[in-house]
């Protein structure tokens, strides 16, 4: 029956695919909306879910019992009715997955696995397809998971029974009854927590099968990851199979340890007690459905399943069964598990099931994909992986990724991906007959959504995560809700928090079950750490989602796929959720935290899904990676063999040997890291993995994926980062103990709080947690073995709580790390996207970070987006650099691997990065992580967001400075890096923490976090030194290979320097060994190379951007959180170590700073202010990581400056697209996306007292330094003046002029990206001259009306890529002329001023001025965003502006002294003051508005601006000679003027809220007001032929519009015809007034008619019709002007009429009607008089001529009234439609349209507006 119904349903679907898709999408939307509303507040999604679960328990306790009975009793789910095809499909999938999981893994039914295994295995193929489709419809899959138990009709019940029998031995491993909650008459959550003895109440008919999963099963339905964490449901029986497959021991401990007894009770007893076995109720987790269904009807469903899968992929692509299993699972766990441990459950189950799931893993919703691969492996090795991928949408990047991505993506995306799924699906179904079952399950799934009230509620809980994920993914800015991350992540958090011991047990059991090796155990420990991080990820949930959202739809899909969002929260669908939960939960079976990747990879991944960690999605993505798909299919047996190992290596088909034999160090670690994989990173990385990983790099890629994902995810959450640091410290401690910790490591992993793991799962989303967990896991796999050899630092890093897995990795890489330090990319610390809650991804990663990076960052994330993207980009660059370095030195490979682990997210981000390099870097990162608790953060570029980035940056700067100094400082940096990375990676998260500024912060942060670094001081010094440089350079961007082979392109250049770097690395290693706690060895290879110096300068600028992007508050929070987490994680020892280390580091940095200042004063006077800044940062060190980075920055000022200069050259050579820059800047400052979001990357910390003191000190120092700098700058300017003409290339400019000024400026930026503190204002005041030049001019040029383009004047001077010639001069602080020409350098100049532009520019430091130039065009909106986003809150922004105004007022006083008081400078000062006042007045007032106003006023004629620019440039040169400040201000002023009419020198400073210094300098362009008489239009020619041509053109366009069918095109053609008619009428005006009148009047009638057709679109507020609104605005303007013109044409007549009428009324003539009048004039009077006439009212008789005149007067005056009324309507529409920016830009480019505008001006204005609209419609992305 079930098969027949399935066949019927398949036919129906074939006939009704579109309808079903629409219905399913609608249902999913509704379901998602409901779940989204339920989980709308992501602040306490777990609380809400817990309350809901408790509510379900109370309300449906009996119902759950009924449900169990009905689930098993009713086969109707399997046999879907026409009414419930979708529900049946969902349930069918769930049944298949459940049966399969029960049979292959520890079956819910405890039946001999043989009976159902074949079916389940067969099912996985079909089921995988179905799962993929379910992935697309997460809500549907969630309901299917809920309804699966109901669907377990006779056949399913039989399957379940068989599976129970088959899986009894598996369950014996899991011992579900042991974990099952004893029947205490306490109702389970709608049967989700159904107990074996309890009958399930089937209050929801469609979810009769789903009812049991309602509590935890929802999460279980969300994915097999739910299986672990919940799926706290009987699903643990189902999930237990998954977990059993991952690690049989883990499965039972999961259920037992589930914080919510329900899930455990569901897992254990249900299978033995009922046909459902109560377990079956848990199987309700969709993850199990496929196995149950598969077991039921393997062969017949096969064909049906193929069809069903295709249909389901089309219909449910967003929410495949896997998604349902995973997504409901994660939310269920969160809801069901009131405690954080639920996430751990996810991770645990994922780990345990992975091994057994091999082929069965498909049973798990998220692992459905895996089973598909396993069963399909022979037949559908290509297709199977693809099919496998879709269920885990998170793995979009893989070949299947499109499908998976579609699955992850919202319904529209799901529809897109479904088609490939369908194609792929049919093939896998052929491989396995069982797949057809999936189809009915899917059908049932939709039904469950529609029909099952209780089940729907459960599903809503499950689908809440899915829906919220979808919504979050849909709304890039809504990531904070991130229901996906919330549902799966919070679920994983609950599991990780509540079930730390369970996770430990599960992991221990999993390790025991696998008995693979240390590596697997280490992986588990790492996963646990990741789970801890996942717990830390509680805060990162929002950030995680935001990262994904910020990344964008593409990145969202990719990120979802990459971060295992498929299960967790790829908002798009249940598939994503299932993948996220399953993949995230398992994290690669080896690590509960990293489990997510396993679920996405394969059945093994489904096990990881059981782990149900939010980061597990990253793992699942990793598993879904192409290498995972083919290999898991091939490795079905291997995966089933060891769930954890299968996770680590099951998808590890490529890494099976490496993981299994090597202790799963390669794959399991990567999988673990994958658990923390950032959603955004996943998109980019998956494709990359598809390319590189399938072959050699499977193991490394697993590590890389885990690390990358972990990095990306960990970046998002600061707490996670702190926790990761602590976990890393524990891991480092374990490194010493790892050999002894084989059993202990499992215990340690279990001991790690699941909360931490949960946070890590979020971190995996955000990148920081996952990088922390991933780095730890990768460390255990890749470098723990070598780390042990490492001296004290590695040992110090060994934290008792850290998983032993790190030991394995650490052991191998230590020597390699030392070697790799110079060569290997120090990427690990860099990539700190998570610094601000992403984005996000979001916001995209810095565009400058790397070209390759930026594109992957497109979306997201990730998100994450922008920040996550930037971070990923940096990571990619670092990965490429690390790969190059690794290639150069094989011995360095381990260190490079650790760096790669950190850079892995970057590599994943950048599709161009080869995976091998990424893998090597990941290994290096792992080693570094093992060495340093901060190593985790540093190891993951994304993890740099963990505020660990500072170490990398700190290390990088010392390296840049010199080999000796870098080695000495790098030693300190290495230890400091551990602590500072955590802080700074969070700060660097947006800017990738690669920037030198970050590095100094890293040094200081390392001093603060030295405890972690102390343990791994030696190792950290070795691994971190190279990785620091690499990461910092990678953060700079792929182009910046200077500091290390951080970027692929940069790596090429750096490879030459890599050889010397290796030698220097040896010296650095020695230095590190000497003082590991004090220094981190930064890439020394660049020290001796001049070009490397330039690169260092560039990297410095980049790091400063990232550093400034991170706020001191964030850093402080990270430090505090890190310390707290360390205490919580029993890392007090390391904390103690860190504290002394921090103190030592601080002292050391201070000494270094002093020395460096002396050196800089001797060598580079301009750097002195930076040093002072660094000192001030050191003072702040306790308060923020920025201080540490600042101190380290001082040590590496000169080298970093030079490197940044060189990088600037590369950057200018490799110009990033202005659009990318703008996107990066916007995302960074977009509060929703990452940059300054929430805490705000550029948070102005009101450390007024400290800042005032620092400012005073800095001002004094800066004054001295400025004098020196001014002298140097004058000299340089003279040199540059010579070079001004040749300075065509930014590289040349950088090399020649950037030396000292760039360094000086760069150190500021490097010192504090986030520090927009008031102290910055004082600092900037001293440094303002240089900063103003670079920042204001650069910003102005970037923000000029041209936008990305450099102002025309600047272009004439030649400013490459929007480098303003004059403006850039200030940035370098050198000759204004030279720097003006060398825009790139001045960008560096801007970068060096993290405190000035910390909010705006520091974040975009990699993009630097280029981005700002780009911003100039998009100036209005982006500036606003940046200014507002730069400040964490409006209040802060207000406060900041007020302080800025005060400081500016103070600074302005000295500035006049410095500057010759010329009118222009006075005007600019006045303008700055005025702007500051305006900013103060409006807390949220964006500097954009002020700048725009300035731009409007500025647009004197370009000639005037040019003249002023030249004059100012001369003044600047003179002033620079006389005084640096004067020069800086003059250059800024000239740069502003040069920037073009829209020159807004203060724009950047204002928009970035660049503390008063940028605004304070007179560079602020003086307001230039446009005169109404300036552009008096010449009269049109009287040539009749020309007029005829105009008329013909108008008629031609009107006729074209008449035949146009597209509403927008029609409106634009009509409007063009109108303006041509207006030109014709204007030309006729001189010939025939009457004809002109007629023409205008007819034109007005025509335009009114056209406007009436456009009104319906105008009323629509959605973005689709935004263009229609703008057309309406232009139309209203034309109507107004035409009406006014008609009045003007009749003005004389109107005057005569008014005079005549006035005379009539004044004279009073006119007969008065009296009652005796025989007849009244009006018929009404006659009627009223009724023949007498006596009742007619009195009145005047108006003569006919007067009446006619009154009518004419009314007509004329109506024109006047209409003119003003229509104009006001247009203005209102501009404001209500949020089109101010568009109109403002149009006004700037074409002059404002006023009531005085001539028809020719109207013509130009409207034509320009329509052209811009068409471009926007044709190329929406470009807009």
Curated annotation (Swiss-Prot):
Q: Pfam families from the xrefs?
A: AFF4_CHD
**Per the record, where are the segments of Acidic residues compositional bias?**
456-466
Q: Which gene encodes it?
A: lilli
Keyword field contains Phosphoprotein: yes
The residue ranges flagged as biased composition, category Basic and acidic residues, are 53-79, 441-454
According to UniProt, the name of this protein is AF4/FMR2 family member lilli
What molecular functions are annotated in GO for this chain? Answer: DNA binding; transcription coregulator activity
Where are the Phosphoserine residues found in this chain? 463, 465, 859-860, 939, 941, 1486
Q: What is the lineage of its organism?
A: Eukaryota, Metazoa, Ecdysozoa, Arthropoda, Hexapoda
């Amino acid at each position: 029956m079930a098969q027949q119904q399935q066949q019927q349903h398949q036919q129906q679907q074939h006939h009704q695919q579109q309808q079903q898709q629409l219905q399913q999408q609608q249902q999913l939307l509704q379901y998602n909306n409901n779940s989204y509303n339920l989980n709308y507040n992501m602040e306490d999604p777990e609380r809400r879910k817990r309350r809901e679960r408790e509510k379900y328990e109370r309300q449906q306790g009996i119902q759950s019992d009924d449900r169990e009975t009905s689930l098993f009793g009713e086969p109707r789910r399997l046999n879907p009715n026409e009414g419930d095809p979708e529900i049946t499909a969902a349930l069918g999938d769930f049944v298949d997955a459940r049966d399969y999981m029960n049979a292959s893994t520890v079956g819910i039914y405890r039946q001999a696995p043989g009976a159902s295994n074949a079916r389940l295995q067969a099912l996985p193929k079909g089921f995988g397809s179905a799962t993929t489709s379910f992935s697309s419809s997460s809500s549907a899959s969630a309901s299917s998971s809920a309804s699966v138990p109901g669907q377990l009709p006779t056949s399913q019940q039989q399957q379940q029974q068989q599976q129970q029998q088959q899986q009894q031995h598996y369950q014996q491993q899991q011992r579900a009854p042991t974990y099952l909650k004893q029947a205490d008459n306490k109702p389970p959550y709608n049967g989700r927590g159904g107990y074996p003895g309890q009958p399930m109440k089937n209050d929801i008919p469609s979810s009769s099968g789903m009812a049991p999963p309602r509590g935890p099963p929802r999460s279980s339905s969300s994915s097999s990851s739910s299986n672990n964490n919940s799926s706290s449901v009987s699903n643990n029986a189902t999930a237990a199979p998954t977990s059993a497959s991952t690690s049989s021991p883990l499965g039972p401990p999961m259920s037992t340890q589930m914080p919510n007894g329900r899930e455990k009770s569901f897992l254990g007893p249900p299978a033995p007690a009922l046909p459902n076995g109560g377990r079956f109720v848990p199987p309700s987790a969709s993850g199990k459905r496929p196995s149950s269904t598969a077991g039921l009807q393997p062969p017949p469903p096969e064909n049906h399943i193929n069809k069903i899968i295709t249909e389901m992929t089309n219909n449910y692509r967003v929410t495949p069964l896997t998604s349902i299993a995973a997504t409901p699972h994660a939310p269920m766990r969160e809801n069901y598990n009131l405690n954080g441990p639920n996430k751990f459950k996810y991770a645990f189950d994922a780990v345990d099931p992975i091994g057994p799931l091999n082929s069965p893993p498909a049973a798990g919703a998220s692992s459905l994909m895996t089973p598909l691969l396993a069963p399909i492996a022979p037949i559908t090795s290509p297709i199977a992986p693809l099919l496998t991928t879709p269920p885990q949408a998170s793995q979009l990047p893989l070949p299947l990724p499109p499908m998976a991505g579609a699955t992850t993506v919202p319904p529209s995306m799901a529809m897109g991906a479904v088609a490939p799924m369908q194609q792929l699906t049919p093939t896998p179904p052929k491989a396995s007959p069982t797949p057809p079952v999936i189809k009915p399950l899917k059908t049932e799934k939709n039904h469950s959504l529609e029909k099952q009230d209780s089940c729907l509620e459960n599903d809503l809980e499950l689908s809440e995560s899915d829906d919220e994920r979808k919504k979050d993914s849909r709304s890039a800015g809504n990531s904070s809700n991130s229901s996906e991350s919330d549902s799966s992540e919070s679920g994983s958090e609950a599991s990780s928090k509540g079930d730390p011991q369970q996770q430990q047990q599960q992991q221990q059991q999993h390790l025991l079950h696998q008995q693979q090796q240390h590596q697997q155990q280490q992986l588990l420990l790492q996963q646990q750490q990741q789970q801890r991080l996942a717990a830390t990820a509680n805060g990162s949930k929002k950030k995680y989602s935001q990262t994904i959202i910020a990344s964008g739809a593409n990145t969202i899909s990719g990120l979802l796929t990459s971060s295992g969002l498929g299960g967790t929260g790829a908002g798009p669908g249940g598939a994503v959720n299932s993948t996220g939960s399953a993949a995230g939960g398992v994290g690669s079976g080896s690590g509960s935290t990293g489990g997510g990747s396993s679920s996405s990879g394969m059945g093994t991944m489904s096990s990881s899904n059981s782990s149900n960690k939010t980061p597990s999605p990253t793992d699942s993505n990793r598993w879904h990676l192409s290498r995972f798909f083919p290999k898991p299919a091939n490795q079905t047996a291997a995966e089933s063999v060891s769930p954890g190992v299968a996770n680590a290596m099951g998808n590890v088909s490529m890494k099976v040997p490496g993981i299994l034999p090597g202790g799963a160090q390669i794959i399991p670690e990567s999988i673990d890291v994958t658990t923390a994989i950032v959603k955004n990173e996943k998109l980019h990385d998956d494709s990359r993995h598809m390319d590189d990983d399938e072959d050699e790099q499977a193991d490394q890629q697993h590590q890389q994926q885990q690390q990358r994902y972990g990095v990306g995810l960990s970046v998002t959450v600061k707490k996670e980062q702190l926790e990761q640091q602590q976990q890393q410290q524990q891991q480092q401690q374990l490194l010493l103990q790892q050999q002894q910790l084989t059993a202990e490591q499992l215990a340690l992993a279990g001991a790690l709080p699941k909360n931490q793991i949960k946070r890590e799962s979020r971190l995996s989303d955000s990148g920081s947690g996952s990088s922390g967990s991933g780095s730890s896991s990768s460390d255990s796999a890749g470098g723990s073995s070598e780390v042990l050899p490492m001296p004290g630092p590695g040992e110090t890093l060994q934290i008792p709580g850290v998983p032993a897995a790190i030991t394995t990795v650490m052991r191998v890489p230590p020597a390699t790390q030392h070697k790799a330090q110079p060569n290997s990319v120090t990427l690990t610390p860099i990539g700190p996207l998570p610094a601000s809650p992403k984005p996000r991804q979001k916001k995209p990663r810095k565009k400058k970070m790397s070209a390759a990076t930026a594109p992957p960052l497109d979306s997201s994330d990730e998100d994450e987006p922008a920040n996550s993207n930037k971070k990923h980009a940096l990571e990619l660059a670092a990965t490429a650099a690390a790969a190059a370095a690794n290639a150069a030195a094989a011995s360095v490979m381990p260190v490079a691997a650790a760096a790669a682990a950190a850079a892995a997210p970057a590599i994943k981000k950048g599709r161009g990065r080869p995976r091998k390099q990424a893998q090597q870097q990941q290994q290096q990162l792992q080693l570094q992580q093992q060495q340093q608790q901060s190593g985790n953060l540093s190891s993951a570029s994304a993890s740099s967001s963990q505020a660990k980035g500072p170490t990398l940056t700190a290390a990088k700067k010392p390296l840049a400075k010199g080999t000796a100094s870098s080695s000495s400082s790098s030693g300190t940096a290495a230890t400091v890096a551990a602590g500072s990375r955590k802080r700074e990676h969070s700060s660097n998260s947006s800017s990738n923490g690669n920037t030198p500024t970050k590095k100094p912060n890293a040094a200081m942060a390392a001093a603060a976090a030295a405890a972690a670094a102390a343990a791994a001081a030696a190792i950290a010094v070795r691994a971190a030194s190279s990785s620091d440089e690499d990461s910092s350079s990678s953060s700079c961007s792929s182009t910046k290979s200077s500091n290390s082979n951080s970027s692929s392109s940069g790596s090429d250049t750096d490879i030459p320097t890599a050889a010397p770097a290796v030698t220097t690395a040896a010296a650095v290693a020695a230095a590190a060994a000497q003082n590991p706690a004090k220094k981190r060895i930064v890439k020394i290879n660049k020290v001796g190379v001049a070009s490397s110096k330039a690169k260092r300068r560039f990297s410095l600028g980049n790091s400063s951007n990232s550093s400034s992007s991170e706020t001191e508050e964030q850093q402080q929070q990270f430090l505090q959180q890190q310390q707290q987490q360390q205490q919580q994680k029993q890392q007090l020892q390391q904390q103690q170590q860190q504290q002394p280390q921090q103190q030592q580091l601080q002292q050391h940095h201070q000494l270094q700073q002093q020395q460096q200042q002396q050196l800089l004063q001797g060598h580079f006077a301009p750097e002195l202010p930076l040093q002072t800044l660094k000192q001030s940062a050191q003072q702040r060190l306790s308060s923020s990581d920025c201080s540490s980075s600042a101190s380290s920055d001082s040590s590496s000022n000169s080298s970093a400056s030079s490197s940044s200069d060189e990088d600037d050259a590369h950057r200018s050579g490799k110009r990033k697209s202005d659009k990318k820059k703008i996107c990066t800047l916007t995302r960074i400052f977009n509060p929703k996306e990452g940059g300054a979001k929430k805490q705000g990357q550029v948070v102005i910390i009101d450390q007024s007292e400290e800042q005032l003191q620092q400012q005073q000190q800095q001002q004094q120092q800066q004054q001295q330094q400025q004098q020196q700098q001014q002298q140097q700058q004058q000299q340089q300017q003279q040199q540059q003046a010579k070079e001004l003409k040749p300075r065509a290339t930014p590289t040349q400019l950088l090399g020649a002029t950037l030396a000292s000024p760039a360094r000086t400026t760069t150190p500021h930026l490097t010192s504090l990206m986030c520090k927009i503190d008031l102290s910055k204002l004082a600092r900037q005041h001293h440094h303002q001259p240089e900063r103003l030049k670079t920042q204001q001019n650069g910003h102005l040029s970037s923000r000029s009306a041209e936008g990305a383009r450099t102002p025309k004047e600047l272009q004439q001077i030649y400013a490459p890529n929007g480098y303003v010639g004059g403006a850039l001069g200030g940035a370098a602080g050198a000759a204004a002329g030279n720097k003006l020409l060398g825009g790139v350098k001045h960008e560096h100049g801007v970068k060096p001023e993290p405190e000035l532009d910390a909010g705006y520019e520091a974040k975009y430091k990699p993009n630097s001025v280029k981005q700002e130039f780009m911003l100039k065009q998009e100036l209005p909106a982006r500036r606003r965003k940046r200014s507002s986003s730069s400040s964490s809150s409006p209040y802060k922004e207000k406060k900041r502006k007020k302080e800025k105004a005060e400081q500016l007022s103070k600074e302005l006083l000295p500035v006049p002294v410095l500057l010759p008081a010329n009118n222009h400078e006075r005007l600019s000062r006045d303008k700055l003051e005025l702007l500051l006042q305006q900013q103060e007045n409006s807390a949220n007032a964006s500097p954009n508005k002020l700048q725009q106003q300035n731009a409007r006023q500025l647009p004197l004629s370009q000639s005037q601006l040019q003249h002023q620019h030249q004059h100012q440039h001369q003044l600047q040169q003179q002033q620079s000679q006389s005084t640096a400040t004067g020069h800086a201000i003059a250059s800024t002023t000239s740069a502003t003027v040069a920037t073009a009419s829209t020159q807004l020198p203060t724009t950047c400073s204002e928009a970035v809220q660049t503390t008063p210094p940028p605004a304070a300098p007179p560079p602020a362009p003086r307001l230039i007001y446009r005169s109404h008489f300036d552009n008096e239009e010449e009269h049109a020619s009287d040539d009749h032929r020309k007029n005829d041509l105009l008329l013909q053109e108008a008629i031609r366009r009107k006729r074209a519009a008449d035949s146009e069918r597209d509403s927008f095109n029609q409106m634009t053609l009509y409007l063009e015809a109108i303006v041509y008619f207006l030109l014709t009428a204007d030309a006729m005006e001189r010939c025939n007034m009457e004809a002109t009148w007629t023409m205008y009047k007819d034109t007005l009638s025509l335009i009114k008619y056209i406007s009436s057709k456009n009104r319906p679109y105008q009323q629509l507020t959605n973005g689709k019709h935004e263009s229609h609104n703008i057309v309406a605005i232009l139309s209203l303007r034309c109507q107004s002007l035409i009406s006014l013109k008609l009045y003007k044409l009749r003005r004389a007549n109107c005057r005569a009429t008014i005079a005549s009428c006035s005379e009539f009324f004044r004279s009073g003539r006119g007969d008065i009607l009296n009652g005796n009048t025989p007849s009244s004039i009006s018929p009404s009077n006659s009627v009223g008089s009724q023949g007498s006439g006596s009742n007619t009212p009195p009145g005047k008789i108006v003569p006919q001529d007067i009446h006619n005149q009154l009518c004419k007067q009314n007509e004329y005056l109506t024109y006047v009234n209409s003119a003003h009324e229509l104009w006001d309507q247009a203005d209102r529409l501009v404001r209500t439609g949020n089109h101010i920016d568009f109109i403002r830009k149009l006004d700037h480019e074409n002059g404002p349209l006023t009531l005085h505008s001539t028809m020719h001006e109207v013509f130009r204005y409207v034509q320009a507006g329509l052209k811009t609209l068409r471009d926007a419609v044709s190329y929406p992305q470009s807009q």
